[in-house]
Each structure stands twice: as structure tokens, then as C-alpha cells.
């Protein structure tokens, strides 16, 4: 991952569905906002100045006008609850992750209720 985070490097790739299935349509990694200083701001034990890999990947698609409807996400770590919600809301239908990381049962429930398939690789 290209992440500059010292604690955990996370990467995310989103691939298409349909006729152009499995083509990369967006990607992101966790890190500081573009153009912002790489200055850590921790509150309640969590970094506040960075954007999660999944969020950056969705922003990448949005900047380029790419629909994520029906797409699949490959991410290095189990998504946090906020990323799970925005991945579902953006039209993602499948999340495949490599490593367990603070797996939240509520995130699993929310994804299941919104018919998003969650698979550990």
C-alpha cells in the first residue's frame, strides 16, 4: 500500500461488474488529505486527520464520475462500521478483505441487511 500511516497501512481497489467485469474502476489507500500537512491529530485514541482507504477509493470514483453500482471491493483489512455503511450506500455489492482488524459485528449485520456480501480471502 502507498499509505504513509505508521500504525496500519490499508489499501482498497474497486472492480466493476457487468460486461466489463473485474476491471479496476477506483483505488485508494489510507492517508492524509491531499495537500494537507502530514501532521497527526489523535482524539480518543483515533487518528482524525486521515481518510480511510475505502473512503479514498469512493472519492476517486466520484471525482472521475464512475458509478460503483454492483461493484466489488478488495480491501486489505476488515472495514470499519463507517466504511461499511458508505460502501453499501455507494452501490457496492461485495466486499472481499484479507486481514481481520477490529471486526465489528454491527458492521457485519449492516452489510448483511443491505445485501452486501462480505468474504474473507
Residue spans of the language-model regions?
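Zinc-dependent deaminase catalytic domain
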Residues: 1-121
Amino acid at each position: 500500500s502507498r499509505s504513509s500511516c505508521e500504525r496500519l497501512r490499508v489499501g482498497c481497489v474497486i472492480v466493476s461488474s457487468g460486461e466489463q467485469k473485474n476491471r479496476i474502476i477506483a483505488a485508494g489507500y489510507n492517508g492524509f488529505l491531499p495537500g494537507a500537512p502530514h501532521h497527526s491529530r489523535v482524539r480518543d485514541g483515533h487518528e482524525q486527520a486521515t481518510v480511510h482507504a475505502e473512503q479514498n477509493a469512493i472519492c476517486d470514483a466520484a471525482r472521475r464520475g464512475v458509478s460503483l453500482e454492483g461493484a466489488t471491493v478488495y480491501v486489505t483489512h476488515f472495514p470499519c462500521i463507517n466504511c461499511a455503511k458508505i460502501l453499501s450506500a455507494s452501490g457496492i455489492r461485495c466486499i472481499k478483505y484479507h486481514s481481520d482488524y477490529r471486526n465489528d459485528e454491527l458492521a457485519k449485520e449492516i452489510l448483511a441487511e443491505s445485501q452486501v456480501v462480505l468474504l474473507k480471502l
